[in-house]
Amino acid sequence: MHRLDDITAPIQQELLDFEIHFQNAMHADVPLLDKVTSYIVKRKGKQLRPMFVFLCAKMLGQINPITFDATTLVELLHTATLVHDDVVDDAAERRGFFSVNALWKNKIAVLVGDYMLSRILLLSIEKRNMDLLEIVARAVQEMSEGELLQIEKARHLDITEEVYFEVIRKKTASLIATCCEAGALSVGAQEERSQLRLFGELIGLAFQIKDDI
């Protein structure tokens, strides 16, 4: 049994149920859009971000429909950023398969990413999850700021250690922090939100440092 399997063992059923929620969230009535989103769904990753939401929620309470809403929102955001990142980086592959922009060109890839971001807004409003929308929106802002900060500093070749940590905190750690905070929020654990956000941020920093090394 792999180490990740050990970690996800307490939430295996929830992760399976999440796949259905995510598929429904990605569904589109426009045939071309639905074709692209179906392609993305079938080539899923390790689902680390939903894992953090579920584990934090289960640690503090009972997983419930709001928890599934939270996992769907963060995975929509993560997936949208991957699609947009591939356009920015002109990447031809993602997870061993052709990227969306490689198959359908940049214009469609950008619009698909935009569609997923719009789904975050609509699903949050439909479910009246304004607190979840707030922390996910903050993650969108920080991730965008981190990406632009990195581009700016790379052009001037003046990335200091302080700037490096600010970049990875915004680009990578902010989303993991959001996942952990969302897990706490979904079960009403208001007092633990800030601690779990910090926990997620530290994990995100460590993850990115290891990846960079």
Model-derived regions: residue spans:
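Mg2+-dependent prenyl diphosphate-binding active-site environment of isoprenoid biosynthetic enzymes
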Residues: L16, Q23-I213
